[in-house]
A protein has these predicted regions:
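Lectin-like carbohydrate-binding module/patch detector with strong preference for beta-trefoil
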Residues: 2-227
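Membrane-permeabilization and membrane-interfacing ectodomains
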Residues: 208-414
Length: 414
């Protein structure tokens, strides 16, 4: 999960490049081009825009071209269109990136560094061939490349792994970087991560007992590059459909129990012992964690396959006698990388949610009836709910992960 920061901010304050991600493990920072940075990149009184990139960090809201020139510097010998995504858990000053192919047969896949041990044998023992790009696996250090400046205005790539060698188009020194195209209008917007102060404030509680669910408040916002999400389509098509997914964390109150007092005008018993406290007994079964795919209940699978994905699959209802399982109306499963799932869980645990244990918890408590509430008519008990929502660039809600804090209850009287 990534927060976003503006390019102009890093140009003004170079020291901020060395700052660790404020979000903790399994997180990173995306650099987006703002109006101020775009103005700086113009000349001829704003009539023309510079396409050549000469400094780091690299923006993530644009497809970039890695351009190799001939010895004269006038003719292009090769051009690769790529997307540079900062490596997780690294400051931007490390200049470590996942290099994603944005065009051709490997579109959507990430460059892989070759290993010295993989040098050819037989006739050409000293030749190290480029490895084919593969889907991203954040655990694979050979898919991380460090970009270095060369002679101020050009670049070259180097493997982070000691025995690794990047693909030739990155390894060769002196290539230029040019802006190919912007991702507008589906480029990442401002996403500042978790707002701890707003989260601790909790949603307003001034609503009637008839309210089943209060209005929600967004307390966190991130972006997730498409390599960490799997849909039922090719990487090439997925990259074209949604290069970045928006993740939000919302808070709201949800009613788990309510009752009415039918004897509101006759509830004071003159013969009642003053030492005996009247209470409302709350009894409710609460599902602590629930998942949804496109609005339908889903189950989360275990980590599996290349990249360590958890698959969220819609729950299909039970079949009747002799009835075939219906496929109609069931959406395709959605996969989330383990880094996204673990980051969400850490955010929850930092907010007081306790993982593990039973999925369904029995809530039982006695709520005392104060003297000022002796004429109450309706009572409701609410649990604090925090919900992660993952949306495509077109706004479609793909996955929703709901966490109920059974230790954060509030009661409402009327």
């Amino acid at each position: 999960m990534y927060v976003t920061r503006t390019l102009s901010q890093f140009r003004k304050y170079q020291k901020t490049l060395s700052e660790e991600s404020p979000e903790g493990p399994f997180s990173g920072v995306l650099v987006i081009t703002d109006e101020e940075a775009e103005t700086e990149d113009t000349f001829c009184f704003g009539m023309c825009t510079r396409t050549k990139i000469e400094k780091l960090p690299l923006p993530q809201d644009k497809i970039l071209s890695v351009v190799h020139l001939d010895s004269s510097g006038n003719r292009e010998t090769s051009v690769k269109k790529v997307l540079f995504i900062p490596a997780l858990d690294q400051p931007l000053s490390s200049n470590r990136y996942y290099v994603v192919h944005a065009r051709g047969r490997y579109k959507g896949k990430v460059s892989v560094c070759s290993r010295e041990i993989e040098k050819g044998v037989c006739c050409f023992p000293d030749i190290l061939h480029d490895k084919k790009p593969k889907p991203l696996d954040p655990r694979n250090i050979y898919q991380t490349v460090k970009i270095n400046r060369h002679h101020d205005r050009t670049f070259f790539g180097k493997s982070v792994a000691p025995d690794g060698t990047p693909p030739s188009f990155l390894k060769k020194k002196g290539w230029e970087l040019r802006t190919s195209r912007s991702l507008h209008p589906r480029r990442p917007r401002e996403a500042l991560g978790l707002d701890d102060e707003l989260r601790a404030r909790l949603p307003a509680f001034g609503f009637p007992v008839s309210t089943i669910r209060s209005g929600s408040v967004i307390v966190g916002e991130w972006y997730c590059p498409f390599m960490f999400v799997k849909e039922n389509c090719s990487l090439s098509y997925q990259m074209r459909k949604s290069m970045f997914y928006r993740i939000t964390l919302s808070q709201y109150w949800e009613r788990i129990y309510h009752c009415e007092n039918n004897d509101a005008h006759n509830n004071i018993d003159e013969n009642n012992d003053d030492n005996e406290e009247e209470v409302v007994s709350v009894e409710a079964n609460v599902v602590r964690e629930a998942n949804y795919v496109k609005g339908m209940e889903a189950v989360k699978g275990e980590k599996e396959g290349h990249g360590g994905f958890h698959w969220y699959r819609q729950v299909q209802g039970p079949r009747g006698p002799g009835e075939r399982r219906r496929k109609r109306g069931v959406s395709s499963p959605v996969g989330l990388s383990f880094v996204v799932v673990e980051r969400m869980r850490r955010v929850m645990e930092e907010g007081g949610w306790v993982g593990g244990g039973r999925k369904v918890v029995r809530v039982e408590r006695d709520e005392p009836i104060r003297i000022s509430r002796r004429d109450w008519r309706r009572f409701g008990c609410y649990v604090l709910v925090e919900s992660f929502g993952l949306r495509r660039a077109d706004g479609v809600l793909l996955v929703k992960c709901v966490f109920r804090h059974t230790n954060r209850l509030r009661c409402n009287w009327e």
